[in-house]
Amino acid sequence: MMGKPQVLTFIDWYKPFYKAGGPVRSMVNLVDHLSDRVDFHIVTGDRDYTASSSPSDLRRDQWVTSDRGEQVWYAALKGRTMGRLKQLITERKWDVVYIN
């Protein structure tokens, strides 16, 4: 039996952030409905829309397991480099890379 498809997703904001509205809600809904069949790895920013700083308790620049089992990488501003993006893309074989 084959494992779940591995999906790497890039989105500017993801939960717990919400001020960006629709795109965040759409990604949360996608994970909610497909997490039993798909392994999501989500790369996102470390602060909410229009926020000048990130929450002090947020774990940045590492994979964090969220409530539906999805892995989330909250990228700090200084960590959003082409080198880091390339590293995340090439660290494993993804079945799909989804850029939202």
Question: Which residues does each PLM region occupy?
Answer:
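Extreme N-terminal starter segment of soluble prokaryotic enzymes
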Residues: 3-7
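N-terminal strand-loop element at the rim of the active site
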Residues: 11-17, 33-79
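Flexible, glycine- and charge-enriched loops at secondary-structure boundaries
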Residues: 20, 75, 99
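Short amphipathic alpha-helix
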Residues: 22-34
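Conserved donor sugar-nucleotide recognition element shared by glycan-biosynthetic enzymes
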Residues: 23, 78-81
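A generic local structural motif
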Residues: 27-28, 59, 82-87
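Short N-terminal targeting/anchoring amphipathic segment
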Residues: 86-100
